[in-house]
Amino acid sequence: MLDENLVTYKSLKLPCSIDTAEAIEQMERAVEQSFEQGYEAVSQLDPLLLFQWMTKIIYGVVYNEILAGIRQQKASGEDMNFSQALAQRFTNLHAMLQSLVVPMEFENTFPFSLVVVPVENAPDTFMYRDEINTLIFSIRMKDFAVIACLQDNATNNIYHEDILKTIAGKKLHPIQFEELCARYFYSAYLFNRLPDYTYLNTPQKVYVEPMPLADMSMKPIFDHWQNKTYGQVLENFWKPWGLTLFEIIKNPEQPISFLLDDQGAFITDVDMPIN
């Protein structure tokens, strides 16, 4: 946690009603059954259900981080200084999580990017990452992996459209998935919009419409991609294979890749351990 305490996921608690707890339990069972079966079942899951499951996790983490921050500020005698951008993201996340208990329709597009890919993982693999400020999440286990940007209006999937087309239907080596994951985590950092939504409550359901991202600023939606910074992200994601930043960006114009060859084609044979 941000206060440097280590806690288990099971120990994270937050308040909810009995009806909500029952809806969460039902959702958890559906996701657990699919995860137990593996990639084929997970890839067939309703994207909204996966979004709800991941949002519940991130929401719980953020909620407990806020409580820890309040305790720290109270102990130091200072007022709580909370990022307004994070507060807006947190508010929208909480509103969309209500789709567990309230019929909700997302107009035009889902508010998230989601990628589910098959991965040749080692037995008992479990790799989880999240980044609270950018609301990005990844998990790798069994024979699959998932990446989700929880509040980007599917923009990161558009940003990575070419590589997603290239790897479609391909089973990834773990180092290939970690490269894909690094690309998403870095692009989520470069994403310079703060998505906002209008909520229309009707007796039947809640309609959620995203505000146009292009209208929010004259700047490009993503900041400029810097290979050195991307290389630093890759170095962190590739720690199990011991690759250094120097090796990764030996050619500063073209960082090393295990996903694509020099012609941009998918690399089918990767001579690296399955970590």
Name these PLM-found stretches:
Residues G77-N275:
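C-terminal, charged low-complexity interaction regions
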Residues F35, Y39, I58-V62, K74, ...:
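Generic secondary-structure transition motif, activating predominantly at the C-termini of alpha-helices
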Residues I18-Q26, F51-F90:
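Short flanking/linker segments adjacent to small metal-binding domains or redox-active Cys/His motifs
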Residues L12, L49, T134:
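Short, well-structured alpha-helical interface segments that form or flank functional binding sites
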Residues V7, F51-W53, R183-A188:
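Low-complexity, flexible helical/coil segments
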Residues M1-Y39:
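An N-terminal structural lobe/cap that precedes and organizes the functional/catalytic core
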Residues E36-F51:
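Short microdomains enriched in Cys/His and/or Lys/Arg
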